[in-house]
């Protein structure tokens, strides 16, 4: 289904409910630049770095697009996904079932989730929705529950240190969304709806958060204007 949620003002606070879940795949494909390519890159990273029978946990798995891509590439991987939106997980379960993929799903908030050992944790545009006071604590749990040699892949919308540069980058991004078919009204409505819900960090803030958890090697492997993907190695 096509994302037309923001054609009119929202009557309630934005949340990943059934309405959003039903159009999420279209929404994210049109709202996040190079989303499909970034997902493919993450799949390749995991395929190359994860050991045989590795345990992979997708934090904020939404409709399980990444988990399905991993299943198609490597049948040996033990896959799990966490999301706090029931509507998202309903679609995720239907999609994985249709392809015969065995995935363990958990319906929980990350700050309440009982983390368990994995070889890879992934959070694609997830941490930006976690309240800042809780964010470091969750990254700490990710590090503590990574097996030695494990990796954490994190994609985030980012801010720039310089306010003027940041403003220009946002303008470039909003032009991108117009090119994807969103009207200026839809863009403005969504921006207002996500204010104080999606809270991005700067590149340095994200890197420092990873370092504070114990990660020693942190690399940026993808960046487009105000979107970036980091890989942290334990």
From Swiss-Prot:
It comes from the Bacteria. InterPro entries: CmoA, Methyltransf_25, SAM-dependent_MTases_sf. The keyword Transferase applies. One of its GO terms (biological process) is tRNA wobble uridine modification. It is an enzyme of class 2 (transferase). It catalyses: prephenate + S-adenosyl-L-methionine = carboxy-S-adenosyl-L-methionine + 3-phenylpyruvate + H2O. GO terms for molecular function: carboxyl- or carbamoyltransferase activity; S-adenosyl-L-methionine binding. Keywords: S-adenosyl-L-methionine, Transferase. The keyword S-adenosyl-L-methionine applies. S-adenosyl-L-methionine binds at residues 35, 60-62, 83-84, 191. Catalyzes the conversion of S-adenosyl-L-methionine (SAM) to carboxy-S-adenosyl-L-methionine (Cx-SAM). Belongs to the class I-like SAM-binding methyltransferase superfamily. Cx-SAM synthase family. This is Carboxy-S-adenosyl-L-methionine synthase. The lineage of its organism: Bacteria, Pseudomonadati, Campylobacterota, Epsilonproteobacteria, Campylobacterales. The gene is cmoA.
């Amino acid at each position: 289904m096509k994302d037309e949620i923001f054609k009119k003002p929202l009557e309630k606070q934005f949340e990943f409910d059934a309405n959003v879940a039903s159009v999420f795949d279209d929404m994210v494909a049109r709202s996040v630049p190079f989303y499909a390519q970034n997902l493919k890159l993450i799949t390749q990273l995991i395929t190359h770095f994860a050991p045989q029978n590795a345990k992979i946990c997708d934090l904020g798995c939404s409709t399980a697009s990444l988990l399905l891509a991993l299943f198609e590439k490597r049948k040996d991987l033990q896959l799990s996904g966490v999301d706090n939106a029931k509507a998202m997980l309903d679609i995720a379960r239907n999609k994985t079932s249709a392809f015969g993929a065995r995935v363990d799903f958990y319906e929980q908030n990350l700050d309440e989730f009982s983390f368990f050992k994995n070889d890879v944790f992934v959070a694609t545009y997830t941490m930006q929705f976690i309240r800042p006071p809780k964010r470091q604590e969750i990254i700490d749990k990710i590090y503590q529950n990574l097996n030695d040699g494990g990796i954490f892949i994190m994609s985030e919308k980012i801010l720039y240190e310089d306010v003027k540069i940041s403003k220009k980058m946002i303008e470039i991004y909003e032009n991108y969304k117009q090119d994807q078919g969103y009207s200026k009204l839809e863009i403005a409505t969504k921006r207002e709806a996500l204010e104080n819900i999606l809270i991005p960090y700067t590149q340095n803030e994200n890197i420092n958060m990873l370092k504070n958890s114990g990660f020693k090697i942190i690399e940026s492997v993808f960046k487009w204007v105000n979107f970036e993907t980091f890989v942290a190695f334990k």
